[in-house]
Amino acid sequence: HIVSCMSAVNVINHIDREKYDVVIVGITEEGKWLYVDSVESIRDESWRDKSVGAVFSPDATEKCVLIERERGVEEVPVDVAFPVLHGLYGEDGTIQGLFELARLPYVGCGVLASAVSMDKLYTKIVADTLGVRQAAYVPVMRGELSHMESVTERVEKHFSYPVFIKPSNAGSSRGVSKASDRSELENGLREAAKHDRKILVEEMIVGREVECAVFGGGNGEVIASGVGEILAAADFYDFDAKYYNEESRTVVNPELPGDAAEKVREAARRIFTAV
């Protein structure tokens, strides 16, 4: 949740206020929607206490945010939504579905693309179909953990340790762990199962970790950014290493052998187009 707030501050600060009127709506961890009157209150985390209730109307004829005022409910018209929500409900097609219901234009991918991209298992199935190389994996369902020995034997049949365990549908490396033996594998499976009913166990690949952003418009053009190399200040790029360890960093356009960078960008474009 705090990551979403940090991202929202960055986005809002880069919007030209001379061109756009910004209506800020925050959602608490409990799911309460609030009208936020300043970026500063997000930055100092006081917005939960200082804000008033707000409701986004799904009425396609209204396209507005309803704000609770002492004198009554104020209707604030909205032309476009810019969701800045990490993880469940924000990146998985849920909030996108609400905007579709209201017929409100919004920034970002649509319902299906968001849902598929958020779910690691489905994304891997797409990558397999495209022939994009990726880490080998074994899918595990939460219900299978009642027969833990059978699950661990299946994993050990495919991989040697260490392996990575991930909830299929979760963000920011939540619930992700690395296992070097069976005991750690069992603990990692139980932890991942707290976040999703689908779990992935992946082989460990020793190498350099890189990332690439992709975006496209309605004209069909798909643009891939330059490649960034992740240098995690930890054993792997977990939640703390991503957001709290200041020694973690990303090198923009690192030196990579041959045409490796372009291969990364092309694979990213292909998957983006497919989903």
Q: Residue spans of the language-model regions?
A:
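Short, intrinsically disordered, charge-balanced linker/junction segments flanking boundaries
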Residues: 1, 268-275
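ATP-binding N-terminal substructure of ATP-dependent carboxylate-amine bond-forming enzymes
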Residues: 1-107, 111-112, 116-118, 122, ...
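Short, well-ordered secondary-structure micro-motifs
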Residues: 35-37, 147, 175-176, 213-214, ...
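Active-site nucleotide/adenylate-binding loops and adjacent lid/helix of ATP-dependent enzymes
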Residues: 2-9, 75, 114-208, 218-219
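Short hydrophobic/aromatic-enriched beta-strand-loop microsegments
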Residues: 105-109, 134, 224
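Phosphate-binding site of ATP-dependent enzymes
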Residues: 180-266, 271
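Glycine-rich phosphate/pyrophosphate-binding beta-alpha loops
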Residues: 87, 173, 230-234
